[in-house]
A protein has these predicted regions:
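Conserved nucleotide-cofactor-binding alpha/beta core module
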Residues: 78-209
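Class I SAM-dependent transferase core
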Residues: 1-90, 98-101, 106, 119-129, ...
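Core SAM-dependent methyltransferase catalytic element
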Residues: 191, 195-233
């Protein structure tokens, strides 16, 4: 296992060789990546891969979608959202808790939803160990929020300044847009393999939304989010 010194060198290399070349140039984001110890959120079996440009599987691995996204993806999402200190954020797909920790350092409050009980418990432990106390991890299927009134019943109290989907969906879930404040942003990786689009939707008015598709990537599906029907003849 690498020494502490090697971890710091690996972290520096990750930022300089992976993150910056991917047009992540926000100094606040780069500084945060240098401070939050990614290796502390990586499962022990994969600790040596903490700074590698790849998705890292998370236990219990019942589904391949349970993983940490590649560092450059997390960094680019963080830059796109531009979360401010006074803002309230919802994340769907806690995983290891690393992205929630990054968001917690930027926001006033973060609510993060994780469908897998073991991961939710592990993420809480990781966040506490990292000294991140403004993140609440709820063991909840994020797709359940798509039903009318489901968010309030589940204790997910909006509206939110930012919503992050830490995984991909076939299309932007319009039901989640209702949880945004005016001026709020939703970040999602949208589409199908082999090419998906990082999509940022901004609520510009009570009934008005704007959308940008800034970059291409691929990410595992969030579980149970709807897939449009396709017909074959």
């Amino acid at each position: 296992m690498p020494s502490t010194m090697n971890y710091e060198q690996a972290r520096f290399n990750m930022i300089e060789q992976q993150i910056r070349p991917w047009e992540v140039l926000d100094n606040q984001v780069l500084s945060l990546l240098a401070v939050v110890k990614r290796e502390d959120f990586v499962p022990l079996a994969h600790k040596s891969l903490a700074f590698v440009d790849m998705e890292i599987p998370l236990p219990p691995q019942a589904d391949p979608s349970q993983c940490m996204l590649a560092p450059k993806i997390e960094a680019r999402i963080l830059q796109d959202l531009n979360v401010q200190k006074h803002e309230k954020v919802l994340e769907i797909g806690t995983g290891s808790g690393y992205m929630a920790a990054l968001l917690g350092h930027r926001a006033q409050q973060v609510i993060s939803l994780e469908i897998e009980p073991t991961l939710a418990q592990s993420a809480r432990h990781n966040l506490q160990k990292a000294g991140v106390y403004n993140v609440e991890v709820l063991q909840l299927d994020g797709s359940a929020l798509l039903a009318p009134g489901a968010a309030e019943k589940a204790g997910v109290q909006g509206p939110f300044d930012a919503i992050v989907l830490s995984g991909s969906v076939a299309e932007v879930p319009t039901q989640l847009l209702a949880l945004l404040k005016v001026g709020g942003r939703l970040s999602a990786i949208v589409g199908d393999e082999p090419m998906m689009r990082a999509t940022l939707v901004t609520r510009t008015g009570e009934q008005a939304f704007g959308s940008t598709e800034a970059w291409d990537t691929v990410a595992p599906r969030l579980l149970h989010f709807p897939v449009p029907s396709t017909f074959s003849f």
